[in-house]
């Protein structure tokens, strides 16, 4: 009897098939990386067996989505279903684009279309399918909703709106919400493509190059940050959401 009991405790090592990995940044910990990707510490550890939490090694790749075979008795071959994160990282650079594509699945209810971005309002009753080229400004304008409403109904979308997923649904209405009459977006004048939110009377444009930031642009053309942001209304306060290869306004 004892040999059989001992045999029942023999476990296979965990096997991980990683489908998406990212390099750690300087100062990253298991907690910060897990939080950025919306996964639990336990899932992160299971996807990265042998990881030495809490500290991570900068520039070493860590798995954040994949399939994990659990520790199982030697007599079974059952595996866990695929684990997928529920969020995208909030870190952005000037090379970010308006939409990204992730091979992940998340839904909020059986009545909602699928797939949806994570964290949508549970009482959402109207959805928008994100397509390439969409951004928060264009979606909000189309449905006549405010930035505060959009962020409240889609809390996992970050402040820079750089983590919209193409081909996923976002929430654009909840019961009782007050919205303004949506208006067709005017066709922008000037060179293309442009950052969203450029004023209609813009006369001078600048193409964002690698290494550009608001300070270097403003210094080069002799304008203030207040002027720059008044002409480029979708650029946030810390200027972390300008897009490489897009035009911004530098004069009216």
From Swiss-Prot:
Domain LysM: 20-64, 126-172, 204-250
Keywords: Cell wall, Chitin-binding, Repeat, Secreted, Signal, Virulence
UniProt cross-references to SUPFAM superfamilies, sorted A to Z: LysM domain
Summary of the function given for this chain in its UniProt record: Secreted effector that binds two substrates, chitin and N-linked oligosaccharides associated with human skin glycoproteins. Could provide the pathogen with three important functions including shielding host cell wall chitin from the human immune system, shielding the pathogen's glycoproteins from host degradation and immune surveillance, and helping facilitate pathogen adhesion to human skin.
Biological source species: Trichophyton rubrum (strain ATCC MYA-4607 / CBS 118892) (Athlete's foot fungus)
Protein's UniProt name: Secreted LysM effector LysM1
Coarse class of the protein's main subcellular location: secreted
Sequence ranges of Low complexity compositional bias: 72-98
Database matches in Gene3D superfamilies: LysM domain (3.10.350.10)
Induction: Expression is induced during growth on keratin powder but not on human nail fragments.
SMART domains for this protein: LysM
PANTHER family per the UniProt record, alphabetical: AM15, PEPTIDOGLYCAN-BINDING LYSIN DOMAIN
């Amino acid at each position: 009897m004892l040999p059989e009991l001992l045999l029942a405790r023999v476990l296979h090592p965990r096997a991980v098939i990683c489908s998406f990995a990212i390099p750690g940044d300087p100062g990253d910990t298991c907690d910060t990386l897990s939080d950025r990707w919306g996964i639990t510490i336990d899932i992160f550890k299971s996807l990265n067996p042998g990881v030495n939490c809490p500290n991570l090694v900068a520039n070493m790749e860590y798995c954040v989505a994949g399939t994990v075979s659990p520790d199982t008795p030697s007599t079974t071959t059952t595996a866990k279903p695929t684990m997928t994160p529920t969020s995208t990282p909030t870190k952005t650079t000037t090379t970010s684009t308006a939409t990204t594509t992730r091979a992940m699945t998340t839904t909020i209810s059986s009545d909602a279309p699928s797939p949806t971005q994570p964290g949508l309002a549970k009482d959402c009753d109207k959805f928008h399918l994100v397509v390439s080229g969409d951004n928060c400004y264009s979606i909000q304008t189309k449905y006549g909703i405010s930035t505060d409403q959009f962020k409240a109904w889609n809390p996992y979308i970050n402040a820079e709106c750089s983590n919209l997923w193409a081909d996923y649904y976002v929430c654009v209405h909840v019961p009782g919400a007050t919205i303004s009459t949506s208006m067709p977006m005017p066709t922008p004048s000037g060179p293309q493509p442009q950052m969203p939110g450029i004023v209609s009377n813009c006369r001078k444009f600048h193409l964002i190059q690698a290494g550009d930031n608001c300070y270097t642009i403003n210094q080069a053309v002799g304008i203030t940050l207040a002027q720059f942001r008044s002409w480029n209304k979708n650029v946030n306060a810390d200027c972390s959401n300008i897009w490489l290869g897009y035009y911004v306004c530098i004069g009216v």
